[in-house]
Amino acid sequence: MYTILDTICFGMAHLTPLPARRRAAGPVYQRLRDLIVRGRLGPGARVTEAQAAAELGVSRTPVREAMQRLVRDGLLVPANGEHGGRTRLVVAPMEVETLVQLYRLAGTLEGLAGRAVASLPRAARARLARRLSSAELAFRQAATAQPLDYDRLFQRHAAVHQAVIDACAGLELRAALEVIRPRVDRFEWYYAPLVGPDLRVTYREHEAIIRAVRRGTADSVERAMRANWFNGALRLARALAGRAGPLPGAT
């Protein structure tokens, strides 16, 4: 269990009013989701319609819709007990068991998608390998930049995996990945601050994916994709299990 100050459910520095044209539920959802994924709303922080609406400068209706979606995503959960006849919602805890399950599921799904490499025409497979190499280079550049921009690093890492999904995943696999994406992204955001800054093991695993794509064998791509996620889960689980107090960015 991670310790946070429950009184800090929203910080005025984190939320700014949305322009009138963006006051639908979608932008409200994205703003709240980003705050949770990036740890600015830490595990256990209480989220209320009234305060979120006031600080975002929107009505409570889009906030209510956004919060319902965040509950479906697993990012908001009911607090223990009731308050005033209504369930209080708090940011979901970050538990090692959940991390391992999510990463193994992501690895299994992306591994299944990667098997489709074998059915790609040779030219398409070569294009995918080039895209992966380019994405990996951008990821490494982001990882070694000074000062380190975690937003950019997160995006560049996601682009490596997205290349395989775009080229290989069918509609059903994409839909399944979207279901777990918000919670996976939340753990991914903490990966580099806790496991890094030395990401050479991750680089080697990405290199294995690229080599497997070039070979074009279904089994090798699936193994490489799964290994990257499964091993990443173990690395982050060890880091989370050994950490006390609030997570990076949670305050």
Ranges and model annotations:
Residues 1-119, 238-251:
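Short linear motifs at protein or domain termini
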Residues 23, 78, 151, 155, ...:
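Short helix-capping and inter-helix turn/linker motifs at the boundaries of alpha-helical repeat units
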Residues 26, 96, 107, 129, ...:
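Amphipathic alpha-helical repeat elements characteristic of tetratricopeptide repeat
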Residues 94-99, 117-123, 143-148, 168-169, ...:
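A ubiquitous short alpha-helical element
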Residues 123-190, 202-211, 220-234:
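Conserved amphipathic alpha-helical segments that form helical-bundle/coiled-coil interaction surfaces
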Residues 195-196, 218-222:
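Hydrophobic/aromatic-rich alpha-helical bundle segments in the mid-to-C-terminal region
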